[in-house]
A protein has these predicted regions:
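Hydrophobic, membrane-embedded alpha-helices of multi-pass small-molecule transporters
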Residues: 77-95, 209-216, 247-254, 263-327, ...
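Transmembrane alpha-helical segments of multi-pass small-molecule transport proteins
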Residues: 158, 185-222, 237-246, 274-292, ...
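Transmembrane helix-boundary motif of multi-pass solute transporters/channels
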Residues: 59-149, 153-156, 166, 287-314, ...
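Membrane-interface loop-to-helix entry segments
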Residues: 160, 171, 177, 208-250, ...
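Membrane-interface "cap" regions at the ends of multi-pass membrane proteins
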Residues: 37-109, 243-244, 253-254, 265-278, ...
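Selective recognition of specific alpha-helical transmembrane segments in multi-pass small-molecule
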Residues: 118-126, 160-172, 237-252, 280-287, ...
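C-terminal membrane-solvent junction of multi-pass transporters and transport-like membrane proteins
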Residues: 69, 432-513, 517, 522-528
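Hydrophobic alpha-helical segments and their helix-loop junctions in multi-pass secondary transporters
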Residues: 173, 177-186, 237-263, 284-285, ...
Length: 535
C-alpha cells in the first residue's frame, strides 16, 4: 500500500488564495450561505473553482454542500473526537447484551476478553484502512462508493447501508424510550397508569417518551455534524464513568465475581466460541467499516485517526469487556442468573437519586450511539439520492420520519424482521466492503480523481457504463449470494458466524480478478471544489 501524507492537497491547490471569510465559499449569488446552515442547498462548487484549469463540469445531480469534499484546512475531528465516537458506540446497550450473551453461552471472563480482543485487533486494522480513505478524499460514503461502483451504481451500497441504519434508528429510539419510561415512573409512580393502553402497539407514555427522544435527536441533527461531534465528545466520558461506577457498585455488592459458570466450555469447543465471538464482534461493526469515512473526512490527520482508533478500539474494547465481565459475574454471584443488559441492573438500584443519574446516563449513551451509527448514514444516502432537494438537515428529518412511521417497536418484537430483513441486509455489507476496499487500496492504490466523482460526462473516470461499473456488480452479486446462504441456510450453521468474512473475502478476490489492474490511475485533489469543513 502506498504511503501518503496526513492530508493531501496538491501543491497547486495550496497556492490558491484563501477565501475572504474562512468559512464562506466564493458564492457571489449566495453570500450568506454557510456550510453549517441547514436549509439552502448549494449545487455548484465555489466560484474560485472556475479559475482552476482542467476541472470537469460538476453535475448538480451529484454535488451539493453535504456531498462535496471537505477542505483540508479547518477540519476539526481530533484523536479525542474519534476516541469519543468509539467510547460511545462500543459501550452501547446492544453491545453489552452481546458480551453478556457470551458469558451465558459458556465462556468465562478471560475467554470473553480474548474473544473481544481478537475482534478488536481486526477492527483496528480494517477501520484504519477505511478511515484513511475518508481523510485522503474528504468525501462521504455515498460519494466514496462512486469510485468502485460508478456515479449511479453507488446508490446500491449507499441505500443498503442507509436502510439498515434507518430501521435501527427507530428501534434504538424505542429502546431508549423504555429507559426513559423507567426513569419517569421512578420519579412519578402515577405515570404508570399511562403505560397500560395500546395505540398502534405503544402506550400513551410510550408515545410521549418516544416522540420526546425523537425530537431531541432531530434538534441535534438540525445543527449538523459539528453538533454531533460536540455531543459525542461530552457523552463519551459520561458513559465511561457511569458504567465503570456501575461495575464497581455491583462488585461491592457481590463481594467477588464469578469468572466462569460451572458448565463453562473447555478445549476445542471453548476456542471455537472464542473465535466465533471475535468474528461476530467484527460483523457488528460491518456498518461502520463501510461509512467510517463519513467521520474521518473531517479528521485533522492520519495520526489522529490511528490514535483515536487505538484508544477507542483495542483499549476501549478491553475496558468494555472487563466491565461486562464484572457486571455479569457479580450478578451471577448474587442471584445465580444472567443479565441481558446494564439496564436490568439500573432498575434494581435502591436509591432513587442514583437510579435517575444512571438512567439519564443510559439515555445520553443511546442517543449518542443512535446519532453516529444510525442517523448519519441514511442522511448521506438520501442526500446522494436527491442532492437537488435534500441537504443534511432535510435528509435527517426525512430519515427520522421514516424511522417513526415504520412503527419500530412492532418490528423489534418480530423475530422475522430482525433475523431475516435486517440480518439479510447486514449480510450484504461484507461483499460491499470487499469490493470498495479492494478497488481503493489494491487496484487504484489510493490514486483518486476526486473532481471526476461529481461529473456525469460519459468520458469521466467513474462513469463506466451508464454510470455503473459492471465489474463491481459482477463481484458483488455472487459474493452476496454466498454470504446470505452461509448466514441463513441451516446446512451452513457451523460457519454462519463467519458469513461477513466469506462475503468480504469472495467479493475482494473476485473484484481483484475482474478489475482492470493495468490501467494508469491519476491522483487529483478535490480541494478546488471542496467546501470549508465545520465538522
Amino acid at each position: 500500500m502506498n504511503s501518503e501524507p496526513d492530508a493531501t492537497p496538491s501543491p497547486t491547490t495550496r497556492s490558491q488564495p484563501p477565501p475572504a471569510h474562512p468559512h464562506l465559499p466564493h458564492l457571489p449569488h449566495l453570500p450568506h450561505l454557510l456550510h453549517e446552515h441547514p436549509d439552502p442547498i448549494m449545487h455548484q462548487p465555489p466560484a474560485s473553482a472556475l479559475a482552476t484549469p482542467g476541472l470537469p463540469a460538476v453535475s448538480e445531480r451529484l454535488y451539493n454542500q453535504d456531498l462535496a469534499p471537505t477542505k483540508v484546512e479547518g477540519r476539526r475531528w481530533s484523536a479525542y473526537n474519534i476516541f469519543a465516537l468509539w467510547a460511545n458506540d462500543v459501550h452501547s446497550l446492544g453491545n453489552y447484551g452481546f458480551a453478556l450473551g457470551l458469558f451465558a453461552l459458556g465462556l468465562g471472563g478471560w475467554q470473553i476478553l480474548v474473544s473481544l480482543g481478537i475482534g478488536a485487533a481486526l477492527l483496528f486494522f480494517l477501520l484504519s484502512l477505511s478511515g484513511f480513505m475518508g481523510i485522503k478524499t474528504g468525501v462521504p460514503f455515498p460519494v466514496m462508493s462512486r469510485i468502485a461502483f460508478g456515479i449511479h451504481g453507488a446508490q446500491i451500497p449507499a441505500l443498503i447501508r442507509g436502510a439498515v441504519a434507518v430501521v435501527w434508528f427507530g428501534i434504538q429510539t424505542y429502546l431508549a424510550s423504555l429507559v426513559l419510561r423507567v426513569l419517569l415512573i421512578a420519579l412519578s409512580p402515577g405515570l404508570k397508569d399511562m403505560d397500560h393502553n395500546s395505540i398502534l402497539g405503544l402506550s400513551t407514555l410510550g408515545w410521549l417518551t418516544f416522540v420526546f427522544l425523537w425530537i431531541v435527536q432531530v434538534i441535534i441533527v438540525r445543527y449538523g455534524m459539528d453538533m454531533i461531534r460536540k455531543y459525542e465528545a461530552y457523552a463519551g466520558p459520561i458513559i465511561l464513568v457511569t458504567l465503570a461506577a456501575l461495575a464497581v457498585w455491583m462488585f461491592t455488592n457481590a463481594g467477588s465475581i464469578a469468572w466462569a459458570t460451572p458448565d463453562s466450555l473447555t478445549g476445542g469447543a471453548m476456542w471455537r466460541e472464542i473465535f466465533v465471538g471475535g468474528a461476530l464482534w467484527v460483523s457488528i461493526y460491518a456498518t461502520f467499516l463501510l461509512n467510517f469515512c463519513d467521520f474521518t473526512r473531517n479528521s485533522k490527520s492520519r495520526r489522529s485517526i490511528v490514535k483515536g482508533n487505538f484508544w477507542g478500539i483495542p483499549l476501549n474494547v478491553l475496558l468494555f469487556g472487563l466491565i461486562a465481565v464484572v457486571l455479569a459475574g457479580a450478578q451471577f454471584k448474587i442471584s445465580g442468573v444472567f443479565i441481558a443488559s446494564p439496564a436490568d441492573i439500573v432498575q434494581t438500584i435502591p436509591n432513587t437519586f442514583l437510579l435517575v443519574i444512571a438512567a439519564l446516563a443510559l439515555l445520553v449513551l443511546t442517543i449518542a450511539v443512535n446519532l453516529i451509527a444510525n442517523f448519519v448514514a441514511p442522511i448521506y444516502a438520501l442526500t446522494n439520492l436527491f442532492p437537488r432537494k435534500l441537504n443534511f438537515f432535510r435528509a435527517g428529518l426525512l430519515s427520522a420520519v421514516i424511522g417513526l412511521v415504520i412503527l419500530p417497536w412492532n418490528l423489534y418484537k418480530s423475530p422475522v424482521v430482525i433475523n431475516y430483513f435486517l440480518g439479510g441486509l447486514g449480510g450484504l455489507l461484507g461483499p460491499l466492503f470487499g469490493v470498495i476496499i479492494t478497488d481503493y487500496w489494491l487496484i487504484r492504490r489510493t490514486k483518486i480523481n476526486v473532481p471526476e466523482l461529481y461529473t456525469d460526462a460519459p468520458t469521466a473516470t467513474y462513469f463506466y457504463r451508464g454510470g455503473v461499473n459492471p465489474r463491481a456488480i459482477a463481484a458483488f452479486v455472487p459474493a452476496a449470494i454466498v454470504a446470505l446462504a452461509i448466514a441463513f441456510v441451516p446446512l451452513f450453521k457451523p460457519v454462519s458466524p463467519f458469513s461477513w468474512f466469506f462475503g468480504a473475502g469472495i467479493a475482494a478476490l473476485s473484484y481483484y480478478v475482474l478489475a482492470d489492474r493495468h490501467r494508469d490511475y491519476h491522483d487529483v485533489s478535490g480541494e478546488p471544489i471542496a467546501i470549508p469543513s465545520v465538522h
